[in-house]
Amino acid sequence: MVAQIKDKLGRPIRDLRISVTDRCNFRCDYCMPKEIFGDDYVFLPKDELLTFEEMVRIAKVYAELGVKKLRITGGEPLLRRNLYQLIAELNQIDGIEDIGMTTNGLLLKKHGQKLYDAGLRRINVSLDAIDNEVFQAINNRNIKATTILDQIDYAVSIGFHVKVNVVIQKGINDDQIIPMVDYFKDKNIEIRFIEFMDVGNDNGWDFSKVVTKNEMLDMIESHFDIEPVPPKYFGEVAKYYKHKDNGAQFGLITSVSASFCSTCTRARLSSDGKFYGCLFSTVEGFNIKSFIRSGVTDDELREQLITLWNVRDDRYSDERTEQTVKNRQRKKINMNYIGG
């Protein structure tokens, strides 16, 4: 283990998010709108994706640099064939203490048991409404919320620790906050509401569509008796609250109204093998895939990863204003390449 590395703003590296595919079986407007990601959209060919062997090699070196947590993302990660094999290999890396996955949940019954047997224990399921019609309008694939709720119940039944992520958009699904808090409170499943972010280039974001953390909290407090919960660790992105009657928790992620750049410890590996220091990056990522395919040693890879982190100075959300979003000259990476 080398000495702990820090970026230009003094932030250590502790988390690595690995996007295993740019494909998804949903077409949510805030991520992959169907008007752009239509039937003729060309996704990455297989040889442009990192292999599992390459992902494991990169993760091993990152573990030597201080990474403790891995998160598998997409696109929709369950579309990557034989994903359980990757989980099993990542689970053997010294120093990795936690592996999670973010998914839309549609294929959990198909793949969940193999993933659990491979060592995956934590899943975040993206579910933006509990009402079938609202959810179908969001995913644009006629998938009912009840279908995903059934998949969540299955995942819990075989032992997974499940959290639910909800991106809230004003006038689209903000009426889902109270019924979803109520539903998952009774299930004692943690739900996290996320402020609508300007990820990618095609989701039509502006401030008028954001429901802030304080607005969400006011809604929830008017219906439930709750109290705040202290953060569990440095860099925790959600502000947590618990119900006083049964202790069930929910979180609010202030990605717009109160940024958490100063405690961000995440490196991101895109589905095409590039390093990014921020979800909102407008700078082309360093191509780790090409670098390792050129025949470099692990020592050379380690030095490159150290350099990439040492020069990191991303703080996009700290600097975001409506004007900077409108005047942005360079495109950001789309979320299907980098995960949420």
From Swiss-Prot:
[4Fe-4S] cluster 2 binds at residues 261, 264, 278. Transmembrane segments: none annotated. CDD domains: Radical_SAM (cd01335), Twitch_MoaA (cd21117). GO terms for molecular function: 4 iron, 4 sulfur cluster binding; cyclic pyranopterin monophosphate synthase activity; GTP 3',8'-cyclase activity; GTP binding; metal ion binding; S-adenosyl-L-methionine binding. S-adenosyl-L-methionine binds at residues 30, 75, 126, 197. It catalyses: GTP + AH2 + S-adenosyl-L-methionine = (8S)-3',8-cyclo-7,8-dihydroguanosine 5'-triphosphate + 5'-deoxyadenosine + L-methionine + A + H(+). Binds 2 [4Fe-4S] clusters. Binds 1 [4Fe-4S] cluster coordinated with 3 cysteines and an exchangeable S-adenosyl-L-methionine and 1 [4Fe-4S] cluster coordinated with 3 cysteines and the GTP-derived substrate. Keywords: 4Fe-4S, GTP-binding, Iron, Iron-sulfur, Lyase, Metal-binding, Molybdenum cofactor biosynthesis, Nucleotide-binding, S-adenosyl-L-methionine. Its cofactor is [4Fe-4S] cluster. GTP binds at residues 17, 71, 102, 163, 266-268. Its EC number is 4.1.99.22. One of its GO terms (biological process) is Mo-molybdopterin cofactor biosynthetic process. Residues 8-227 form the Radical SAM core domain. InterPro entries: Aldolase_TIM, Elp3/MiaA/NifB-like_rSAM, MoaA, MoaA_NifB_PqqE_Fe-S-bd_CS, MoaA_twitch, MoCo_biosynth_MoaA/MoaC, rSAM. It is an enzyme of class 4 (lyase). [4Fe-4S] cluster 1 binds at residues 24, 28, 31. Catalyzes the cyclization of GTP to (8S)-3',8-cyclo-7,8-dihydroguanosine 5'-triphosphate. HAMAP family: MoaA_B. PANTHER family: MOLYBDENUM COFACTOR BIOSYNTHESIS PROTEIN 1, MOLYBDOPTERIN COFACTOR SYNTHESIS PROTEIN A. Belongs to the radical SAM superfamily. MoaA family. Monomer and homodimer. This is GTP 3',8-cyclase. It comes from Staphylococcus haemolyticus (strain JCSC1435). The gene is moaA.
